[in-house]
């Protein structure tokens, strides 16, 4: 059997920019697929392309990234999804404070380009593993980026937390349930609101490595217990917890609804923690 690889959780390849507009038939097909498994469009989160570096100090690169984020947000809104999450990118040689201004400007540009809809699709910053000078590794960095968004648009923004990224960035969520709660408390206190989603991933690399390499829950450096602790925290009730763990099936047709074996194991593990 080939080794598991990470599944596609984006609308298409996350490593390339996308410029096409979603046509109504595609939106209808997506809604029908969600309905088949008992989900409303608001249960959907879209991950923007990884290549969008909205924090870049290079003017042209930052401009293209902002334009790309706006297009991603337009398509996410067309789907009626809850939010479009993205990695802010790297500050490069510039100061983090200056990079935060550029990220905030890109978020505002996306929100201003698309009228607010009923329910309000949001632009959501995802925390990062902290490689190089990437923005978003700490609650303070996320808070300063969101603070750059005009007050009139701020309610259409937010953030989410990836467990692999937290661990890789040096947040000790693996030590105990109490330490995990302290980390979540710090993000909520500093940013002023709870996360809009969690990405549930174990880590292939050790604590504080700054490497973003996902592993199956309980089979990486984090271990299984932190996920039990997380699900026992009241903050996860009603907040989407999304698996981004490696899959075993490397090629899956768009119309194939068969569960990936690795995904099925992960869901069973999480349900066991919940006693369901």
What name fits each language-model region?
Residues 1-46, 52-71, 276:
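N-terminal pre-domain/capping segments
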Residues 8-10, 42-48, 84-86, 123-125, ...:
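Hydrophobic faces of well-ordered beta-strands that scaffold small-molecule active sites
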Residues 13-15, 49-51, 89-91, 126-130, ...:
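Active-site beta-loop-alpha junctions enriched in small/polar residues
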Residues 18-29, 56-68, 94-105, 133-144, ...:
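Alpha-helix N-cap and loop-to-helix initiation/capping positions
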Residues 24-46, 103-118, 145-150, 221-233:
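Alpha-helix-loop-beta-strand connector modules within alpha/beta enzyme cores
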Residues 54-158:
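Active-site acidic/histidine proton-transfer and metal-coordination neighborhood
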Residues 135-143, 167-238, 246, 254-261:
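Gly/Pro-rich active-site loop or hairpin
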Residues 252-276:
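C-terminal helical cap(s) of enzyme catalytic domains, especially alpha/beta-barrels
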């Amino acid at each position: 059997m080939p080794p598991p690889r990470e599944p596609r959780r984006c609308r298409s390849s996350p490593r390339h920019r996308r410029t096409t507009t979603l046509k109504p038939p595609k939106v209808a097909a997506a809604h029908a697929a969600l309905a088949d498994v008992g989900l409303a469009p608001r249960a959907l989160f879209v991950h923007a392309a990884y290549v969008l570096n909205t924090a870049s100090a290079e003017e042209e690169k930052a401009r293209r990234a902002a334009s790309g984020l706006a297009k991603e947000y337009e398509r996410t809104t067309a789907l009626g999804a809850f939010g479009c999450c993205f990695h802010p990118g790297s500050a490069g040689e510039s100061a983090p404070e200056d990079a935060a201004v550029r990220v905030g400007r890109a978020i505002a540009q996306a929100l201003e380009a698309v009228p607010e809809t009923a329910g309000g699709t949001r632009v959501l910053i995802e925390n990062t593993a902290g490689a190089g000078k990437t923005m978003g590794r700490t609650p303070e960095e996320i808070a300063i980026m969101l603070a750059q968004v005009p007050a009139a648009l701020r309610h259409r923004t937010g953030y989410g937390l990836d467990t692999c990224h937290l661990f890789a960035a040096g947040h000790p969520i693996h030590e105990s349930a109490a330490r995990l709660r302290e980390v979540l408390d710090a993000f909520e206190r500093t940013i002023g609101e709870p996360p809009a989603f969690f990405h549930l991933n174990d880590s292939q690399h050790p604590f504080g490595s700054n490497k973003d390499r996902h592993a199956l829950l309980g089979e990486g450096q984090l271990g299984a217990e932190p996920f039990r602790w997380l699900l026992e925290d009241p903050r996860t009730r009603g907040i989407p917890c999304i698996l981004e763990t490696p899959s075993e099936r490397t090629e899956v047709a768009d119309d194939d609804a068969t569960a990936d074996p690795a995904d099925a194991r992960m869901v069973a593990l999480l349900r066991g923690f919940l006693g369901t």
